């Protein structure tokens, strides 16, 4: 399979996003990456979906890959939602959302709103519905304060690359990838918290079929938080558990 066809997507606030497209099938998947990632890390995922009869479109969310925006920053989580909506408009017809990690929280945040064209189903891989390692209270308090007075301050995200996959080659490639970054900002953190709260409060409004892929050995996103959301979900749902696998299920 060839590499992605690169497209340019303009989000609502005029931020330019790079997107990739694979295949030309009549059925569409909108694929979303995790924090600090880019479309190049999902070529193999897109290839499998194309083989299964799907056309795949994937944006690099603002601040990621070669899209515009500061790394590890968004002024509002809703800006990510707008990035997804702009990509969906490019697709122009009903689609399925497939999302990993941070992309899972962005996907569900998008589904809290009416989408045009509509999303007809969603599949999530270890979504960011909670963090596996809780930050000390003093760090959380500092992040909330800095979000108000210095929201764009770049700080180390403290993500352990060895926790993404059991495959040493995947870890080595991740650590050497020039488009992967290791920073976050206080505003990103508080917007993530707010998005998780909005999801818990509005979950009952999402009714489309949900497929959740969950690793109980995930040391990055909290599998218990994702499982709680799954149990509370009132629409059609299926759950696939992969107990021994690490965070990046698509790279195990």
Where are these regions (language model features)?
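Active-site glycine-rich loops that stabilize anionic/oxyanionic intermediates
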Residues: 26, 34-37
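Catalytic nucleophile-loop/oxyanion-hole region of alpha/beta-hydrolase
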Residues: 36-39, 65-91
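Short beta-strand/loop motif that positions the catalytic acidic residue
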Residues: 206, 212-214, 218
């Amino acid at each position: 399979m060839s590499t992605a066809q690169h497209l340019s997507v303009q989000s609502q606030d005029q931020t330019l996003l790079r997107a990739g497209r694979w295949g030309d099938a009549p059925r569409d998947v909108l694929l979303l990456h995790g924090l600090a990632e880019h479309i190049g890390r999902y070529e193999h995922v897109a290839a499998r979906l194309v083989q299964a009869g799907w056309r795949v479109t994937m944006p690099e969310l603002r601040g990621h890959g070669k899209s515009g925006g500061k790394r590890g920053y968004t002024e509002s989580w809703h800006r990510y939602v707008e990035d997804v909506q702009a990509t969906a408009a490019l697709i122009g017809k009903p689609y399925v959302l497939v999302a990993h990690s941070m992309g899972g929280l962005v996907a569900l945040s998008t589904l809290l709103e009416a989408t045009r064209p509509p999303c007809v189903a969603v599949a999530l891989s270890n979504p960011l519905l909670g963090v596996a390692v809780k930050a000390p209270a003093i760090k959380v308090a500092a992040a909330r304060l800095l979000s108000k007075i210095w929201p764009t301050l770049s700080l180390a995200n403290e993500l352990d690359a060895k926790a993404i996959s059991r495959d040493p080659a995947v870890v080595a490639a991740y650590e050497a990838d020039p488009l992967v970054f290791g920073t976050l900002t206080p505003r990103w953190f508080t917007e993530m918290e707010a998005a998780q709260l909005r999801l818990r409060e509005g979950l009952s409004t999402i009714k489309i079929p949900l497929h959740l892929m969950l690793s109980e050995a995930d040391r990055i996103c909290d599998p218990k938080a994702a499982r709680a959301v799954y149990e509370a979900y009132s629409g059609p749902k299926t759950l696939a558990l992969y107990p021994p696998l690490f965070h990046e299920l698509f790279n195990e």
